[in-house]
């Protein structure tokens, strides 16, 4: 499978094309739009989330509620585009340059992207570099999550920490309803209250906050990925996918950083054979060994830096005059940490769905289901 996204933050729409989905997968906008709503949620978001009420349209590849095997085209309209039609016009003219953005924002793509692509109007950089693009990736990921659910795989995400405040309650699959009900995507009510206070203070200060997200998947068959070649190792592919999301700066699988300071005897997960199957009583590895799923729960933690657009701008330079300036201010969030967990579950879900198809193949969902079931039976009897 593969996909491509296109579109700018304030352009008419975001577009995604997915190629390689098996046919006969039940799919409709009701499988995608709830994920888009989750992405827009969370305490600390800005006014853009009020303007946009994201809904996907399926333009190809699905008929009568099932994929056909043809490329699937998804479109998400940018409602705010009506306020930007002249500035974002693709036609030659003076209006776009009248409001040129020339004060590069530290921490953003502005300066480096301007140098790379030779833009002096930095809007030509930020419009595509914007995290608005993640709406398209969530739509794509929602399709992948639908495929995984048809193969018996379930995912979850929550906020492990925000602004230095940690979720102290250990994760449990029984807490999913509480996580979904929380505007901070944490089951820890005390931590959520402290996070809100921290966000409110940051907003008053014109500042932003980052955090750590945890994403989990259960029900994965043994052997997704490979140890044979570097580019087929699933942990590397998951890390790349996570770090490709705007503002994500670090990835941990299992208890990686804690494990780094422990002796091996306290790190590696002992294997036992009980009741006719292989079991581990611990999961320090986070469900991946030597680049392959081992049948345990996949656990991925991702560090998100604070959003780079500040309401109290940092010092920078005007790229036209080279004079000192305050960084440009764009409408932004105080934090998007809760939404980031949703995005990360979707992008990791894509990697896992891709790995499923690579290992098991099949032009149709029934073929794929049969092969996954056979692989699970083999691993059970091994």
Curated annotation (Swiss-Prot):
Function per UniProt: This reaction introduces a second double bond into the aromatic ring system.
Organism from which the protein derives: Deinococcus geothermalis (strain DSM 11300 / CIP 105573 / AG-3a)
UniProt binding sites for NADP(+): 39, 45
Entry-linked SUPFAM superfamilies: Chorismate synthase, AroC
UniProt subunit comment: Homotetramer.
Cofactor: FMNH2
EC number: 4.2.3.5
Name used for this protein in its record: Chorismate synthase
Sequence similarity: Belongs to the chorismate synthase family.
UniProt catalytic activity: 5-O-(1-carboxyvinyl)-3-phosphoshikimate = chorismate + phosphate
